[in-house]
Amino acid sequence: EPLPIMAKLRVVKSANEIACLAEAGRQACAGYAKLLEYAVDGAPETMAAGAAEGAARMAGAEDINFMVFGSGKRTETVIGRATGKIMRDGEMVMAAMAVQYQGYVATVEYPFVIGKASDEQKRFLNILFEAANIQQNYLHPGTVMGEMVRNVKAVFAKYGMTKYDLYPPMHGIGLAEAESPYPDENSTAEFEPGMCVNSDISLWGAPEGSNRIEEGFVITSGGPQSLTPGIRELIAKGL
């Protein structure tokens, strides 16, 4: 029966596949750095989105699979496109970009506020950052995926944010932007060396706004290795 063999080959990546994902991640981080530079008061969303896409292309990307962008109230669109809306100081930005290299796709998303964040926005963002940093502790070979999901959800529960946590915090990556595994809190499968995954940690419809974190990792014998180090550095730093 070939299907289980093919599924296993898709879930556990070869060294060459990991190298392609790492390069896609590098290009995505280059693009996101430019997005952060252009997401300023008075600029349209399309300018920041276009700057990110152009920088990723200049870094070697063969395709931008998608660009999700929303500022202010538009963060609630979840997967909305960039528009001509003018961004303003104090608005939160939700922006995700999926970058393809040699057929392999890495996605990055870092939630932030233009200008100075309010105390409420800082609390909201730091909850997301804490959940993402806690997730790191469970990205090890032999760890049950459901345990990772439960511990991410526990962070949201601690702060009374469970009702804004609408879907599981991780999926696989590879030839598709999102592919197996898709763990939830009941998953019994274990992480294995060579698996490549993307965090998808989000809160939607909270009074402070809506946003999401996406960053890529390869599971190694020593734990998670970032495929998108520019984003990992920002999240680890927090506010």
List where the protein language model places each region:
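Active-site neighborhoods and metal-handling regions in enzymes and metal-associated proteins
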Residues: E1-L239
